[in-house]
């Protein structure tokens, strides 16, 4: 396959792929009248159960429409949340998600799935204003939020991400969008990848990509070794930063670029003169954690927890996904050390609480519909994933 390349990156022998190779989606006309009509039905359905409301506004997104409602005086918010099944029945919707209240507003949000969903293409996100503003090499495309804005996620500030969702909910498409974003935006000198794919079918397409530190790992036992290597590399980088007197990878690389790093006299283990190298970011992607936990649970958990606790400062970041969000896969230690979560549709309320520590993921409609819970946020953001 021949891939069209763009111009050479300044100061690098590499050229980034041309944005033209990514598919763009067709423009989609919004049916505002149909959305308004459903808003009227929504108010009537609530009034039939004795809850008087006023429709403040509505936001039409690619997957759902959010109706913002103010309730009458003396009406408890819990009255509305208890009527979710009745609301879904009145609107002939598969399910609805209720935000009571919308964070920062004196209104209740009711999210109703659109009759026709809009396709969100990765090419659209990477061509957006938000992508052009992105400066960090680990900012990746995720999708569009409920207001239609492109969402770029900075994995460096997360600094690690835990993804969970049922089979077919869109986890692998999301991971592919993230990896493709790295390949489209950065050169191998800046970001390196370790891809762990026990399912054997998702990561094979990246074989031979220059960003890879090793071929995609499909054997769960070898995957445990790859994670252990990442731990050793983290420790080596801390040793280098300690000797050079820098707190993190940003300060070290800036000093390297300025030419401020002077290696001490002497030879390394191979008899070569000691030198300092620029440290690339390393992104470790695990596409199915449950398979690894079945084979080497203790080793895998130890490596993931050590990386999650310490690796941020030296530029090593984790993206860990599983289709089985149970406590024997997403253990308490792993959850405690990876505060950023991305939840796709799950089968039950219990699964939603394992991944998000709150309800909501059981109300998602699948096919890339997700909730992003940032490391310092208590209210998840609803996003339609890019494809």
Would you name each region that the model predicts?
Residues 156-159, 183-228, 333-334:
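P-loop NTPase switch/communication element
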Residues 4-9, 74, 105-139, 144-152, ...:
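P-loop NTPase motor-domain active sites and their immediate coupling elements
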Residues 102, 167-168, 322:
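The conserved Walker
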Residues 18-31, 66-74, 158-167, 209-217, ...:
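Short hinge/gating elements
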Residues 171:
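Conserved lysine of the Walker
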Residues 1-160:
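Low-complexity, intrinsically disordered P/S/T-rich segments
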Residues 174, 178:
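Hydrophobic positions on the alpha1 helix immediately C-terminal to the Walker A/P-loop
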Residues 22, 39-42, 46, 87, ...:
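Residue-level signature of catalytic and energy-coupling elements of molecular machines
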């Amino acid at each position: 396959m021949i891939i069209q390349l763009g111009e050479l990156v300044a100061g690098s022998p590499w050229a980034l792929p041309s944005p033209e190779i990514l598919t763009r989606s067709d423009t989609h006309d919004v049916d505002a009248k149909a959305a308004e009509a459903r808003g009227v039905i929504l108010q009537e359905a609530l009034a039939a159960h004795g809850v008087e409301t006023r429709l403040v506004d509505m936001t039409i997104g690619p997957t759902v429409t959010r109706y913002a409602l103010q309730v009458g005086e003396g009406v408890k918010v819990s009255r509305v949340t208890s009527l979710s099944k009745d609301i879904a029945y009145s609107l002939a919707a598969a399910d609805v998600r209720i935000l009571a209240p919308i964070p920062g507003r004196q209104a209740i949000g009711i999210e109703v799935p659109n009759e026709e969903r809009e396709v969100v293409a990765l090419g659209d996100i990477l061509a957006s204003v938000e992508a052009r503003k992105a400066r960090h090499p680990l900012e990746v495309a995720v999708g569009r939020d409920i207001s239609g804005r492109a969402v770029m996620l900075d994995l460096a500030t997360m600094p690690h991400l835990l993804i969970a969702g049922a089979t077919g909910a869109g986890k692998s498409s999301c991971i592919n969008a993230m990896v493709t974003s790295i390949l489209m935006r950065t050169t191998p000198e800046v970001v390196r990848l370790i891809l762990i794919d026990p399912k054997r079918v998702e990561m094979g397409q990246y074989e031979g990509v220059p960003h890879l530190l090793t071929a995609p790992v499909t054997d769960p036992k070898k995957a445990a070794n790859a994670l252990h290597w990442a731990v050793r590399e983290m420790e080596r980088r801390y040793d280098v930063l300690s000797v050079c007197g820098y707190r993190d990878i940003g300060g070290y690389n800036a000093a390297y670029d300025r030419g401020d790093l002077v290696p001490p006299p002497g030879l390394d283990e191979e008899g070569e003169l000691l030198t300092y190298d620029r440290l690339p970011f390393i992104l470790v992607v695990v596409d199915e954690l449950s398979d690894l936990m079945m084979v080497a649970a203790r080793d895998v958990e130890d490596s993931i927890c050590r990386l999650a606790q310490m690796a941020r400062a030296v530029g090593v970041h984790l993206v860990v996904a599983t289709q089985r969000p149970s406590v024997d896969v997403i253990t308490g230690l792993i959850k405690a050390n990876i505060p950023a979560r991305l939840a796709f549709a799950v089968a039950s309320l219990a699964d939603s609480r394992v991944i998000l520590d709150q309800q909501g993921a059981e109300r998602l409609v699948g096919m890339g519909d997700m909730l992003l819970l940032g490391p310092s946020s208590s209210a998840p953001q609803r996003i339609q994933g890019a494809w």
